[in-house]
Amino acid sequence: DSFYHEGVPVGAGRAVNAPAPAWRAHSGTVDWGDAATATSGAGFPAASALIAETLGEEEEKVVFIALGALTNLYDVLRENPASGDRIDRIVWYNSRAEPLSGANFETDSVAARYVLASGVPVTVVSANPACPVVVTPALIDSVAAVPNVYARKIAATHRTPPLAKLVGERHLEAWDDLVAVYLFAPELFSIRELNGTVRACELSDKSAAAEAQTRLTAILRGKPDSESRLFYGFPVGGALYAADVVPIIDSAVARHGLSEWRAGVLTNELHGHLGIYATIGVKMGIRAREYFNIGVDDILVTTYAGHKPPVSCMNDGLQVGTGASVGHGLITVAEIDTPRPEARFTFKDKTIRLVLKPRYADRIRRDVKRGIELYGDLTEPYWQYVRALALRYWLDFDRHEIFDMYVGD
């Protein structure tokens, strides 16, 4: 849960009672993250059932990425061979394709042979011993410079025992990671057709291996235009912003991420002034998308903020933060007697409800009341006061702390 993607479906695989790979004990000592201890599978649905459900729900064919044994997919295809029609291709990391060998194959060789013979297209990605992609301190430094939570976690883990020692000894290489490189830069790989539906690929030469290190960092950095339609990236240069906004830019982006900054800027331009509840709506919308780990335009929203300012101003932030706009028909304003800073978010039949915690709502009311006492209601000095409050809340309010979350509600 350390990345706040709690809504991403997780399933527990079937035990095959195979011997653990040689590195299992060592890997168990690595600090992978907050949820690393939840390895028993208790409370999770069966992986095969989750895969089958997901394949059935997707509108387009799926690229199925496998970084371990093929047991779960084998169970799905054996139960319902037609499920393979929903898969565009399988991209599987395995140590060797010719002949088949390595932990991912040997853990469940029956499953691997079945899937490879199923007729579903399979690309087997393997490391090339002649040109390994070594995880060096310089590569970890490059990863650490990428400004997102994933890169920071990777860098911190590899700078901490026991991985730090292995990095220093140049023992670690990119193995499973090569699947991501292949998906984003297939031109770096040489490909051999093994039969009509199965092919093997590995990095073609040392030049490709060197380029793979650069591509790994680029993959973590992501596309600058992943959320924008007109911008390539989003401007954060101080020269483009009002003088009172400039001091918070770097800190707000570092603390809350570029996605929240982008949505906050666009919302307040749309809203007509730098508003408190508009900014709360942004944070709420981004948090909901983060929970499901989805992009914009993918979520249904019901807001309980009503139609009357100031609370209804939250609706503008919700639209921009989620992409669930009135024009797309993805947001509904509930007709209620007492508006409140609360909204429901639904994605693929799963729903969460976010509510601004009372202590934050009370703080906003007290601060706004103080402004009215000092400057009068809706006067120009009052709006300047509200603007300063909104900037302070934008920077100080952490979207992971200010909302109560109710799942399936």
PLM segments and residue spans:
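Non-transmembrane, aqueous-exposed alpha-helical and coiled segments at domain scale
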Residues: 222-274, 280-409
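Active-site nucleophilic cysteine motif
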Residues: 172-181, 273-283
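N-terminal acidic, glycine/proline-rich low-complexity segments
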Residues: 1-233, 408
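Generic detection of long, well-ordered alpha-helical segments
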Residues: 206-210, 278, 308
